[in-house]
Amino acid sequence: MIKTGLFFGSFNPIHIGHLIIASYIHQFTDLEEVWIVVSPKNPLKPELELLEEEERLKMAQLAVEHNPSLKVCDIEFYLPKPSYTIDTILRLESDYPGRQFVIIAGTDIFKDFHRWKEWENLISGYQFYIYNRPEYDAGDFANHPSVKIIKAPL
């Protein structure tokens, strides 16, 4: 099984901070690849002034084109919107049976994990690599056996 990290986000736009975190997690964990999963619509975030979906996707592709350990994944462009992590990961498992997927998120996102669709199935079925955001606490799940806190540089 190829261990692949899924780094979800709006990437509005993708920036050096995203790339540093993705590269760091790839380099200092057991992940063989990190996929940047561009989310057209996050169900837990208000509608902000987002760049067009295709623009965000293209910028992400350009940002990682010279880094073979990072790949852009556009699966959520082909799924019903809004996109839910559980639906995306189940589809990816169906499409890529030779991979073990790990969910990458920041403590700013993970603090609301209890609001995610089917969070119980996610926490019991998948590993989470959570990178520390100094101003946010990982919440009640920080000590869960499925959660690994990563001290990534910011």
Which residues does each PLM region occupy?
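Nucleotidyltransferase catalytic core that binds NTPs
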Residues: 1-154
